[in-house]
Amino acid sequence: MDPGPGLAALQAWAAKSPAYGAANQTVVDKVPPDMMHMIDPHWYQFPPMNPLWHALLGFTIGVLGFVSISGNGMVIYIFMSTKSLKTPSNLLVVNLAFSDFLMMCAMSPAMVVNCYYETWVWGPFACELYACAGSLFGCASIWTMTMIAFDRYNVIVKGIAAKPMTSNGALLRILGIWVFSLAWTLLPFFGWNRYVPEGNMTACGTDYLSKSWVSRSYILIYSVFVYFLPLLLIIYSYFFIVQAVAAHEKAMREQAKKMNVASLRSSEAANTSAECKLAKVALMTISLWFMAWTPYLVINYTGVFESAPISPLATIWGSLFAKANAVYNPIVYGISHPKYQAALYAKFPSLQCQSAPEDAGSVASGTTAVSEEKPAA
């Protein structure tokens, strides 16, 4: 049976590497000599990966990079060029898109080239910069999402008593996010852990296989401040957000029964509904972020505690899921943000395949308007 040109091409790719399937060959054989000092002895026990995995990873990362760079670039352009979207709350959305945009600009092209050569080809210092960039932008993304959750908590739970976030307040939060993220990601350059090639040899990350507990402590403490603490803060925010929304809806239904009407919805209630919609969007985005980064955390903890063997193939999935995070945010906000859609279709009519959403259904801009009308505390 003829395998077809596509399968034949993949088989030819797999056959071109004499190392794959050969005896006494390891996954580190193609690593350049100037990087051998960075390779942990753990990886010498594994044979070369099937070139098909490198091809699949390179293709997937290339697609994710294209979608993320174009999608996040579009989000940044639309939000910054549309007057009605230039609100304090949306500055956090822009910062999130900016972080994801830079992540894929820094990581996707380099990894595609590495997958073609089936090893890291950019040298030791570029490996460290690559890993530092992934850590920096990942940290910035999760803390930006945490600030978005706090903003929703302030508007929805505290209501009219809340002090609205100003542009200066949003910019100060963004500055704090980047300073905090940069501080954590620079520490490995000063001896607390280090950045090394991962098991697939096409990406770089933190050294979670080190036997030194000083080095291991970086992984553990970093995960507390960049994974578990934001998670707890976000859960706290959304617990009270859901509680407040449920109480509001219950009060509305009870009042409607007393007045013998179907609904008490008014323009003010519509604004509250918009707040609830944005809370759902943010919660979805955050859930996708944790789905993306949890596999990488599990791999790091598995290495630190030596609870199970880690294969080069397993490290591929950690890299893939982590980078997929940069694709989720523009999709989520583009689908569920009517005012963003309206601005997008106005600037790029060719993208419109259905009638433009009504501007009155705005989510993010509507919530900001509610906030800005409140008196300062």
From Swiss-Prot:
Q: Which InterPro entries match?
A: GPCR_opsins, GPCR_Rhodpsn, GPCR_Rhodpsn_7TM, Opsin, Opsin_lateye, Retinal_BS
- Membrane topology reported for the UniProt record: Multi-pass membrane protein
Q: Does the keyword Transmembrane apply?
A: yes
Q: List glycan-bearing residues.
A: 24, 200
Per the UniProt topology annotation, the Cytoplasmic ranges are: 80-92, 151-169, 242-280, 336-377
Q: In which tissues is it expressed?
A: In the retina, expression is abundant and uniform in the anterior-posterior and oblique cells of the retinulae, with some expression in the proximal cells. There is no expression in the dorsal rim retinulae (at protein level).
Annotated region (Disordered), positions in chain: 357-377
SS bond partners: 127-204
Give UniProt keywords alphabetically: Cell membrane, Cell projection, Chromophore, Disulfide bond, G-protein coupled receptor, Glycoprotein, Membrane, Photoreceptor protein, Receptor, Retinal protein, Sensory transduction, Transducer, Transmembrane, Transmembrane helix, Vision
Q: What is its main location?
A: membrane
Outline what the protein does: Visual pigments are the light-absorbing molecules that mediate vision. They consist of an apoprotein, opsin, covalently linked to cis-retinal. May play a role in photoperiodic photoreception.
This one is known as Opsin-1
Write down the species: Manduca sexta
